Structures are given as structure tokens and as C-alpha cells.
Amino acid sequence: MTTQKYKSLLVIIWALWAFHPCLAIDDVLRTAKRDAILAQITGAVRPKKQISLISFGAKGDGKKDCKPAFDKAMKRAAHMGGAHIVVPAGEYLLNGPIHFVSNVCLELQEGATLKFSSEPAFYLPLVKTSWEGTFLQNYSPFIYGYQLENVSIIGKGVIDGNAGTTFATWKSKQKIGQQLSREMNHKEVPVAERNFGEGYWLRPHLVQFFDCKNITIEDVFITNAPFWCIHLLKSENIICRGIRYDAKLVNNDGIDPEYTRNLLIENIEFNNGDDNVAIKCGRDNDCLLYTSRCV
């Protein structure tokens, strides 16, 4: 009986030794594949020309509406072919969204806070977006980019959605809009006819880049989002690194990649009221129509 046990043990040891080279080869292949993917993920190319938000009339006193200054800075950046927009320390009230243009790096320096208004009307008119996997028109995300290249949000500053008193209360009212959006999805209603917004209670995202390439979001602190914090929709070549969260309102997912490829997420401090990372590929018929390869 003892001899039989030793024979069994010898067989097991021999089997492990025999397959060890194969396991080592598999590890090498996996590492090579991983490294090949990582080599493709470069994030945004950052422009060298710098402009200060202050030069466009912004004031970091927490009282003056700085949306016009952001709009002017983005317009200037577009005219320049790209720019690095620097936001120095201070609290910047925004009565409405920031709409990015291509080739812009938005740097929130340490001590800088973007504090968005809690007034829903400021996030109209409607923009092309997606809500829980259905493409539609809805309130603008607070920071939004559509069909852009080379966009960055960096720095040790804060993005405060300030959504606790309004948008965070909408979940109990959203059923009418949620059901209608899904019906339109199932019936394949043209996306241009799926108009929501006021009266439908579908909360906007805090940050959304839609159909964009070459994105970097790095080091910023995110809090009080109205819905998902960072929504990366139909986008590619993205780096999310060093982001810090204290976002515990309803459905404050950290990072939601949807129909997205070549995304690196690393060194994140999650403290979220929902999923930290939720990989998505749309919903129902929209998913079947728009699914693309994700890596």
C-alpha cells in the first residue's frame, strides 16, 4: 500500500515536471501579447502651447460663472490647432457643461476645483449620448467630447459634479424615460428621434468621451457625480491613471468603457457608490447593431 502511494506521487511529480516547460511558454506568450497591446495604448498627444483660463475672464471665487471662459478657451484652442489650458488654484463655478475640442489638454492644477451647477436647465440643449446602453439625445454630460482626437484631463485638481441636491434625486422618477428609451431601442427607432431631456429624468454623465481617439485622464479627483463618473463610449486608445474618487451618490460608477478598445486603467483610488469599473457593450438591439471589437 505504501509502495503504491509512492508510485502515485512519483507520477504526479513527473507530470508536473513534464508540463512545466509548456506552462513557461504559455506565460511568455501571454506576456508578449499583453506587452503588444500595451504598446498600442499611448493616450493623448499633449499640445505644447499653453493658455491660462484666467486670461479668458475666469475667476476662481466660486461665484462667477466661468462657463463663458471655458467656451472661449476651447474656441481659441481650436483656432490654434490645439492648446494646453491651465486652470490655476481656485473654485470655478460652471453654469453648464464644458464641451471639448480636439487637441486640448485641460490641466486642473492642485487647489483648482471645477464646481458644476446643480440646475438641470444649464445642461440643455440635448446632445448625442447614450443612457444605460441605449443611444439617444439627452442632457449634456458635464464634461463632453464627441468625435474628437487627443483630449486630456490632467492635474491634481477636483471635478465636483455638485449633484447631491438635484440629479441624485432623479432615480425614483426615471422609470418613464428608462422604459421609453428601451422601447425605442427594441423598435429600432432612429437615434435622431430619441429625444429625452426635461421631464424624462435621465441623469447625465459627469465625463463622457463619445467616438473619440487618444484620451488621457490622469490624477484628478472626482466627487458628487450626477450618474456614471467617466463614460468612455465607442472610443479607443485611452489611459486612465492615478484618478482618485469620493463619489458615492446613486449609480456613481467609476469608469464605464462601452464599445471601447485599447484602454489602460491603472493606479486608481476607487471610492464609489456603485461599480468601480463596469465594462459594457450596449443594450438589446442597439448592442446588436453597434457592437465593435473590444480589447
Label every model-predicted segment.
Residues T2-I13, W17-C105, Q109-E218, F227, ...:
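Extracellular "leader-to-stem" segments immediately downstream of a signal peptide or signal-anchor
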